């Protein structure tokens, strides 16, 4: 019998947010991608299953996971086709890519590049442990709950590039397109 379940969801369930920062009170809107849609459907199935089969679940709505554990057992691998900024950065630093394309410099941000909330994979693992403890200790307020998992602070693409360069001592070849 299943008593407790943790679902790895995504902030993409919010669609195009009305305001920032995005809180758990923000409405779930039409997803902008098949990935976001799959997370919305997953949450709906789990919520209905919790009611029908009397078990508890928490959906953790990840923002943008980055980084690696010092053991290198979890985290970014600069292989394959990247799906977000950090693998593009690491592939450029490793020489797999000649140049990093930065898409746009006309966003309403301090440097004109898009801003995202990033969460380190170790902090994400800690969120899973906290969610599991909440369920095991029966501290949940309802049988299906959801929590945003991010830093709560946004970083622009250029800020991420500059932070990577500083931390790694590597200069990245990038171009605004």
Predicted regions and their residues:
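Residue(s) in the substrate-gating loop at a strand-loop-helix junction
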Residues: 10
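Structural signature of the Rossmann-like NAD(P)-dependent dehydrogenase/reductase core
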Residues: 5-7, 58-61, 117, 148-150
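Active-site loop of short-chain dehydrogenase/reductase
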Residues: 1-5, 54-56, 99, 141-145
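Short aromatic-enriched loop/helix-cap "lid" or pocket-rim segments at secondary-structure transitions
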Residues: 18-20, 69-74, 114-115, 161
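Hydrophobic, Gly/Ser/Ala-rich alpha-helical and linker tracts in large acyl-processing enzymes
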Residues: 69-82, 89-92, 98
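C-terminal substrate-binding subdomain of Rossmann-fold SDR/epimerase-dehydratase oxidoreductases
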Residues: 86-177
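Feature marks short, surface-exposed loop/turn motifs that line or immediately flank catalytic pockets
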Residues: 14, 66-69, 153-155
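Catalytic helix-loop patch of NAD(P)-dependent Rossmann-fold dehydrogenases
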Residues: 4, 13-59, 64, 73-84
